[in-house]
Structure formats: structure tokens, C-alpha cells
Curated annotation (Swiss-Prot):
Membrane topology: Multi-pass membrane protein
Phylogenetic classification of the source organism: Eukaryota, Viridiplantae, Streptophyta, Embryophyta, Tracheophyta
Family note: Belongs to the PsbZ family.
Keywords: Chloroplast, Membrane, Photosynthesis, Photosystem II, Plastid, Reaction center, Thylakoid, Transmembrane, Transmembrane helix
GO annotation terms (biological process): photosynthesis; photosystem II stabilization
GO cellular component, one term: photosystem II reaction center
Functional summary from the UniProt entry: May control the interaction of photosystem II (PSII) cores with the light-harvesting antenna, regulates electron flow through the 2 photosystem reaction centers. PSII is a light-driven water plastoquinone oxidoreductase, using light energy to abstract electrons from H(2)O, generating a proton gradient subsequently used for ATP formation.
Subunit note: PSII is composed of 1 copy each of membrane proteins PsbA, PsbB, PsbC, PsbD, PsbE, PsbF, PsbH, PsbI, PsbJ, PsbK, PsbL, PsbM, PsbT, PsbY, PsbZ, Psb30/Ycf12, at least 3 peripheral proteins of the oxygen-evolving complex and a large number of cofactors. It forms dimeric complexes.
Gene this chain is encoded by: psbZ
Transmembrane segments: 8-28, 41-61
The protein's name in its UniProt record: Photosystem II reaction center protein Z
Length: 62
């Protein structure tokens, strides 16, 4: 169970780092938002899911 928690936290950190870089780039590009809207929403949905997963796994471990 601890390994699953650590992997979920690692995935959350990686996803956060990717979104931290990619979202401002998408907004700064001239046609970025209209062409990459689905990618931003998918990344955000993945991030929210990982936040809930880490919370659930944390409550099971401690």
C-alpha cells in the first residue's frame, strides 16, 4: 500500500510540474487555447483525480 501511495504522490508531482509549464505556454501562444483546450482539460482532470487518490491512500495508510 505504501508503494501505491508513493507512486501516486510521484505522479501528482510530475503532473503538477507539467501543468505548471504547459498551461502558461498554451495561454501565451496566439492560437494555443483554442487548439489545446482538450489537452489542458485532460491534464487538469488527471490532476484532480490524483489529488483525490492521494487523499484516499493517505487516509488508508495513516
Amino acid at each position: 500500500m505504501t508503494i501505491a501511495f508513493q507512486l501516486a504522490v510521484f505522479a501528482l508531482i510530475v503532473t503538477s510540474s507539467i501543468l505548471l509549464i504547459s498551461v502558461p505556454v498554451v495561454f501565451a501562444s496566439p492560437d494555443g487555447w483554442s487548439s489545446n483546450k482538450n489537452v489542458v482539460f485532460s491534464g487538469t482532470s488527471l490532476w484532480i483525480g490524483l489529488v483525490f487518490l492521494v487523499g484516499i491512500l493517505n487516509s488508508l495508510i495513516s
